[in-house]
Amino acid sequence: MEIKQIITEIKQKLDAKGGLKHVYFVACGGSKAAIFPGLYLLQSEAKTFSATTYTSNEFVHATPKELDERCVAVICSLKATPETVKAVETANAKGAITIAMTGSMETGMAKVGQYVVVYSNGAPQDYSNSNQACSLRIGFELLHQIEGWDKYDKAMDAYQYINEIVDEAKKECLPAAQAWAEKEKDEPV
């Protein structure tokens, strides 16, 4: 299911319960860094609901008291670390709606998440469908479908340019990166 359809379905469920009150972005390590764009977007733009981030273990062992059926938990891990799978289970147990962002449909997170977003994570990389891009897309859809966000069309249009922009940047930076690597290759670590 596409992110747009996922959020449409989630919105219908939340509307029946009084609406969305909070979005939790949960992950650890590099995945936590990758979901930050969605968190930042919602913290900056949302007017009728709030958003925070937790590490997976923190979410499991210091579960927020306000976590309930009016919350969405966006939980991310490429290979579904055990603590991140447990975070999905924790959110499910509290009645929250879970979106498991993961590297394949075979992961433990994909098995326990109510909704699953599989993001691009290999070669060749589709940056418009990376974990960062999917985190943002979830945020854009929540803002659009819940609040009628006026920048939605422009944001969605931008996805068509992401791969081209990244490819150009890689080409532009490669000579400098190679020169730096050659210069520093014998430095002690």
Predicted region positions:
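Acidic catalytic cores of enzymes that act on phosphate-bearing nucleotides/polynucleotides
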Residues: 38, 48, 180, 184-189
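A short, well-structured juxtamembrane/interface segment
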Residues: 2-19, 168-185
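Internal, active-site/partner-interface "lid" segment
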Residues: 142-182
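Glycine-rich phosphate-binding loops that contact phosphosugars or nucleotide phosphates
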Residues: 18-159
